[in-house]
């Protein structure tokens, strides 16, 4: 039975819940599985869609691969702009 004066002791081993302590140092992860703390707004990482940027250009026949070394400047710009369709405009004006 604890004494009334135990609550006023500077260091009372019985005051706190007993932990899983091995050795003389304190650690939050002694002998157990790793503990992961995540914020409430944490969202799991979503898997990226399979395929490359070239495969994103779709024709009625399906995705096609594009060889940029054989393209003209206008074809490249048209392809580049079609890949970026729907992206936000991140330009900053100083």
Curated annotation (Swiss-Prot):
Lineage top rank: taxon: Eukaryota
InterPro entries (alphabetical): Spg4
Family stated for the protein in its record: Belongs to the SPG4 family.
Function recorded in the entry: Stationary phase-essential protein not required for growth on nonfermentable carbon sources.
The protein's name: Stationary phase protein 4
Record organism: Candida glabrata (strain ATCC 2001 / BCRC 20586 / JCM 3761 / NBRC 0622 / NRRL Y-65 / CBS 138) (Yeast)
Gene name of this polypeptide: SPG4
């Amino acid at each position: 039975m604890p004494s009334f004066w135990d609550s006023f002791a500077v260091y009372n081993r019985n005051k706190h819940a007993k932990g899983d302590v091995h050795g003389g140092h304190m650690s939050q992860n002694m002998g157990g599985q790793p503990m992961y703390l995540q914020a409430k707004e944490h969202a799991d990482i979503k898997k990226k869609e399979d395929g490359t940027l070239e495969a994103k250009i779709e024709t009625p026949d399906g995705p096609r691969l594009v060889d940029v070394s054989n393209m003209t400047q206008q074809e490249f710009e048209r392809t580049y702009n079609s890949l970026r369709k729907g992206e936000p405009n991140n330009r900053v004006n100083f």
